[in-house]
Amino acid sequence: MSSGGLLLLLGLLTLWEILTPVSSKDRPHFCHLPHDTGPCNRNTQAFYYNPVYHTCLKFIYGGCQGNSNNFKTIDECKRTCAA
């Protein structure tokens, strides 16, 4: 790659770093997982972080398995992922 191409790449990476919100860099990786109801049928209200809308949303959790993007309260979701 030519020095001009490397300079362009460096400039684009720098611009991307500047434009990426700090909060999304510090957010735990599991906050970007889709909500997962799991295979059980307990059907309890839970909350997950939606990275597209940058907010916590309600969903019905089956009560077992699923993933870590699963919170008992909206406040817990906000403290963990939306702060």
UniProtKB/Swiss-Prot annotation:
What compartments host this protein?
Secreted
Q: What does this protein do?
A: Serine protease inhibitor.
Q: List the disulfide bonds in this chain.
A: C31-C81, C40-C64, C56-C77
Q: Which SUPFAM superfamilies match?
A: BPTI-like
Cite the position(s) of the site with description Reactive bond for chymotrypsin: N41, R42
Q: Which GO terms describe its cellular component?
A: extracellular region
Organism equals Notechis scutatus scutatus
| Name used for this protein in its record | Kunitz-type serine protease inhibitor tigerin-3
Note the Gene3D superfamilies from the entry. Pancreatic trypsin inhibitor Kunitz domain
Family assignment?
A: Belongs to the venom Kunitz-type family.
* Domain BPTI/Kunitz inhibitor span(s) in chain numbering: 31-81
One short Pfam name that applies is Kunitz_BPTI
Q: Which InterPro entries does UniProt cross-reference here? A: Kunitz_BPTI, Kunitz_BPTI_sf, Prtase_inh_Kunz-CS, TFPI/VKTCI-like
Q: Where is the signal peptide?
A: 1-24
- Any one Gene Ontology molecular-function term assigned to this protein's record: serine-type endopeptidase inhibitor activity
Task: Specify the superkingdom.
Answer: Eukaryota
User: Primary place of residence?
Assistant: secreted
Provide the free-text tissue specificity comment from this protein's UniProt record.
Expressed by the venom gland.
Keywords from UniProt, A to Z, are: Disulfide bond, Protease inhibitor, Secreted, Serine protease inhibitor, Signal
